[in-house]
């Protein structure tokens, strides 16, 4: 068992799903996978695992191909989404490699059967992997077009009985407006699912937020760029926004 297992009871969130965008893997680039950036994320995941957390991941594919963008350029949407799902498998395999280089046992499960390179998605097997301290990366969304990786992440978080869905982003939470465009924007400490949907705050797509609301699983939005931020979220500290049924006024 991990060396931090004795500290597990201090964690606010013990079993979590971490959602990363494909773009996050680009680092400072315009396309593809930046290995040093992946290594930074992997170190944060390894640190969280050592603290006793059980972690699964969903990674988008936008750094390689976005189905919506392909459809906008004239491709059939279902075909474009299938390409996007394949991009998420590439990202999952890259992250698996980086994690295993750090000594973190990792399994990739795909919603599309690719037996030569990863496991098929089997819910009970994924649960068992996590119980044994392995990191599980869910790839290929839910295996169907017209569903985003945000929705796939929400579904997997529910199926894995996660305590929270953690969304690692480029900003440190949810703001009243885009802080890059509006200097008066303020960050919410807590906010209700319904307010996210009503104000269309663009944290995740509406289907994902609705799934989280209906199953009463909190979403925590935080910046992965800050050292130790993932561990801080697991302990319920640091800078972030928590989305719950009740919500709260912004600070």
Swiss-Prot record:
Activity regulation note: Inhibited by UTP.
CDD domains, per database record: AAK_UMPK-PyrH-Ec
Keywords of this entry: ATP-binding, Cytoplasm, Kinase, Nucleotide-binding, Pyrimidine biosynthesis, Transferase
Domain of life the protein comes from: Bacteria
CC terms in the record's Gene Ontology section: cytosol
Matches recorded under SUPFAM superfamilies: Carbamate kinase-like
Compartments reported by the entry: Cytoplasm
Pathway(s) per entry: Pyrimidine metabolism; CTP biosynthesis via de novo pathway; UDP from UMP (UMPK route): step 1/1
Keyword Cytoplasm: yes
GO molecular function: ATP binding; UMP kinase activity
Chain positions recorded as ATP binding sites: 19-22, 62, 66, 169-170, 175, 178
Stored InterPro entries: AceGlu_kinase-like_sf, Asp/Glu/Uridylate_kinase, Uridylate_kinase, Uridylate_kinase_bac
Main location: cytoplasm
Amino-acid positions noted as binding UMP in the UniProt annotation, renumbered to this chain: 61, 81, 142-149
GO BP, one annotated term: 'de novo' CTP biosynthetic process
E.C. numbers: 2.7.4.22
Reactions catalysed, as given in the entry: UMP + ATP = UDP + ADP
Family (UniProt): Belongs to the UMP kinase family.
HAMAP family, alphabetized: PyrH_B
Functional summary from the UniProt entry: Catalyzes the reversible phosphorylation of UMP to UDP.
NCBIfam families per the UniProt record, alphabetical: pyrH_bact
Assembly, per entry: Homohexamer.
Protein's name according to its UniProt entry: Uridylate kinase
Originating organism: Hyphomonas neptunium (strain ATCC 15444)
Lineage: Bacteria, Pseudomonadati, Pseudomonadota, Alphaproteobacteria, Hyphomonadales
